[in-house]
Amino acid sequence: MIGLKRKFKYIIFLFLAFPLFAQNEIIIDVRTIEEWNTGHLDGAIHIEWQDITSISDTVAKDKKIYLYCRSGNRSGKAKKILNEAGYSQAINAGSITKAKELLNRDIIYN
């Protein structure tokens, strides 16, 4: 029974993580959840900058990762952390406004 339970958890993990594996690029909003809830880029996922290494189990090291925040400061910190963890394609897209222009994405307001 324990083996079945473990397999089930793994299947759920793969199902939830599949979109991250399948995309050519990932857009990550590293702001706080409160900031995210005021609006974020279409297609972005939310991971606060200090938790950015949580992607290591689901995102390949050579995947292109765009990071943005309010001003570019926290996304710069997140980029540095990812670079040090071996992510060579981490890109600081700067502020949400700059990232919107760079990535040609709309802002989704909640």
Where are the regions that the model predicts?
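Rhodanese-like catalytic fold shared by cysteine-dependent sulfurtransferases
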Residues: 2-6, 24-26, 33-63, 73-110
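Sec-dependent signal peptide recognition
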Residues: 6-13
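Hydrophobic h-region of N-terminal signal peptides that target proteins for export
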Residues: 13-22
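Short cysteine clusters
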Residues: 69
